[in-house]
């Protein structure tokens, strides 16, 4: 068990929920669960063919916003917070009428005022963007666009079940530029069945050529219950082995670094100053509020989520499985999330938050991991090396196990 003092004051425990983010900053995530077609790999809460529910769903979002604009257990959120980031994800937010998005963003001001220069991101599919929707997003204050490109190979796009073509990715970026967006992310996927290193390199080069500010490169995870999992289980599809996956990741690091994109988290790369501020809140364990079906929240040291069932959400079910995190929960989450970033774990911040040096009781594990080339300590931070990030889960378990 931990040698740290478990009898911290309630005031100190509450401070942990904002580990590196000022208390006054709040992030909001809004889930739009509708999509034109469920992708073969997707196990997110997304629902095709529910157009008739769009209006009801956003009415429920508005009702949830009204609840959060009223007095909560800790008082009015508007008295404590300013909204620093807002992220509209899905599903496919760009599928629904843009008016819903405009009204929802505007309504969030009832929860708390926006900080000057707040980052407001809308996620979307290149096949569902139009100039009219982009203009509406700009009017609503959206200043960052995240597009699910996934691949530039037509065959791979079809096998993934994507509804857009490779050509529409470039068209979407052009449309976004013409609408005034100067902060665009593209999501890419690797370790796909049938994808070789040449195809992955071509995808990286195609994304770089579009000149976007941010790129995310996610390794395919074959989730149980998805069509992709059924294909893999039947032998109809074969995913690359671990060595091939790691080689693809290293290719992304090298190719993107040469093009001016700096890796700042296991799966994310940005031009200097264009890191996704919203995701940094998650990795730094700042306070965030999730609105909509399946949305998760971390607020004032409490974690809770809305139901994943769209029908339950439409019926008014809210805030399931609410728990107040223990000190051990806080430490484990902090370690797991901070080591995803290139910056790593801030050792002074850890000691300030938890009352003892991180190294105490972990000397042997740290020594083994350093000797193995998986972690390094310097500049007041413990960070994972490139090799360490390839096995991040195992590194974190090693560090946690030393403290049991």
Regions found by a protein language model. Give the residues of each.
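C-terminal scaffold of the Radical SAM
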Residues: 25-27, 46-72, 81-356, 404
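Conserved N-terminal Rossmann-fold NAD(P)-binding element of oxidoreductases
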Residues: 30
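Short amphipathic alpha-helical interaction segments
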Residues: 356-368
């Amino acid at each position: 068990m931990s040698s740290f003092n478990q009898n911290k004051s309630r005031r100190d425990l509450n401070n942990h929920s904002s580990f590196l983010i000022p208390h006054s900053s709040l992030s909001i995530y809004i889930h739009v669960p509708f999509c034109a077609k469920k992708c073969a790999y997707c196990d997110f809460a997304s629902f095709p063919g529910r157009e008739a529910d769009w209006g009801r769903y956003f009415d429920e979002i508005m009702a949830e916003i009204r609840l959060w604009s009223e007095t909560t257990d800790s008082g009015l959120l508007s008295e404590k917070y300013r909204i620093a980031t807002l992220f509209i994800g899905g599903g496919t937010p760009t599928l629904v009428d843009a008016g819903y998005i405009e009204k929802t963003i505007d309504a969030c001001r009832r929860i708390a005022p926006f900080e000057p220069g707040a980052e407001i991101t809308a996620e979307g599919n290149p096949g569902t963007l139009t100039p009219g929707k982009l203009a509406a997003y700009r009017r609503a204050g959206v200043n960052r666009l995240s597009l699910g490109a996934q691949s530039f190979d037509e065959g791979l796009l079809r096998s993934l079940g994507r509804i857009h073509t490779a050509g529409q990715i470039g068209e979407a970026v052009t449309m976004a530029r013409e609408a005034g967006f100067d902060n665009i992310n593209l999501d890419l996927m690797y370790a796909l069945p049938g994808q070789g290193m040449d195809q992955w390199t071509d995808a990286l080069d195609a994304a770089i050529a579009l000149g976007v500010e941010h790129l995310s490169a996610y390794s395919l995870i074959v989730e149980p219950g998805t069509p992709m999992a059924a294909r893999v289980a039947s032998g109809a599809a074969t995913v690359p082995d671990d060595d091939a996956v790691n080689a693809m990741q290293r290719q992304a690091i090298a190719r993107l670094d040469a093009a001016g994109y700096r890796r700042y988290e296991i799966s994310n790369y940005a031009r200097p100053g264009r890191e996704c501020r919203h995701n940094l809140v998650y990795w730094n364990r700042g306070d965030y509020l999730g609105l909509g079906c399946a949305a998760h929240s971390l607020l004032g040291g409490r974690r809770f989520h809305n139901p994943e069932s769209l029908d339950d959400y439409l019926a008014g079910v809210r805030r399931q499985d609410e728990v107040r995190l223990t000190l051990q929960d806080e430490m484990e989450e902090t370690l797991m999330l901070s080591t995803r970033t290139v910056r790593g774990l801030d050792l002074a911040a850890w000691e300030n938050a938890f009352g003892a040096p991180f190294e105490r009781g972990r000397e042997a594990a740290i020594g083994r991991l350093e000797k193995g080339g998986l972690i390094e300590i310097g500049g007041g931070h413990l960070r994972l090396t490139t090799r360490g990030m390839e096995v991040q889960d195992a590194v974190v378990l090693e560090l946690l196990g030393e403290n049991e």
